[in-house]
């Protein structure tokens, strides 16, 4: 899917590389996807991005867009990622999802929770 992906694995014809969902009246959302893998990104020799998912949030207007990234807990590449390391220490935990058995679907899919906070001391870091 990615323009520089040279892997010979078969592509899933149902995966478009992007999705869209709306929040409910409480601001909650849910979606299903594959867990992305790490990839080399050429920033410097042997540079890899950790597993992550980009989120684009839109308000009432298309121009009111916020972008952030969600990382997965325990990823060994976080300690090398300049996007993650560029965040103040106290905000880094807000960038990492939390594994949750409550949203895990038995025999099907692991579940993670990622709360996006728009304002306040624990606001999610946006790009």
What are these regions (language model features)?
Residues 1-127:
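Beta-strand-dominated extracellular/periplasmic modules and repeats
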């Amino acid at each position: 899917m990615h323009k520089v992906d040279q892997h010979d694995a078969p592509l899933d014809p149902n995966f478009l590389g992007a999705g869209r969902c709306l929040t409910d009246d409480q601001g909650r959302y849910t979606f299903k996807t594959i867990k992305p893998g790490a990839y080399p990104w050429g920033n410097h020799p042997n540079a890899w991005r950790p597993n992550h998912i980009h989120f684009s949030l839109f308000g009432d207007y298309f121009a009111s867009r916020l972008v952030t990234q969600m990382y997965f807990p325990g990823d060994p590449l976080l300690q090398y990622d300049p996007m993650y390391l560029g965040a103040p220490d106290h905000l880094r935990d807000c960038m990492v999802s939390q594994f949750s058995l409550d949203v895990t679907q038995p025999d099907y899919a692991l579940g993670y929770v990622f709360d996006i906070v728009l304002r306040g001391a624990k606001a999610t870091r946006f790009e």
